[in-house]
């Protein structure tokens, strides 16, 4: 989506969150509530866009989190 990759890592833990990567930049956002946890290289305008994308898709992302981690126990 807009060149951003949204992903989970197999060793991720709660709280429910998503990692975002584009080029050499990466960030981590918690899902409930959607909030920035870590940023390495994204500009503030990019972070606002990423946060808006996550807000719009938070239920879908959470569904995929639950499917991923419930299937990998």
Protein language model features and the residues they cover:
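Multi-pass alpha-helical transmembrane bundles in non-GPCR membrane proteins
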Residues: 1-3, 24-26, 47-52
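A short, structured beta-strand/loop element
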Residues: 6-43
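C-terminal structural segments of small proteins and small subunits
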Residues: 44-73
């Amino acid at each position: 989506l807009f060149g951003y990759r949204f992903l989970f890592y197999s060793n991720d833990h709660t709280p429910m969150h998503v990692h975002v990567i584009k080029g050499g930049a990466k960030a981590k956002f918690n899902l409930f509530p959607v909030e920035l946890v870590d940023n390495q290289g994204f500009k503030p305008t990019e972070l606002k866009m990423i946060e808006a994308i996550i807000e719009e898709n938070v239920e879908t992302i959470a569904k995929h989190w639950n499917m991923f981690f419930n299937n990998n126990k």
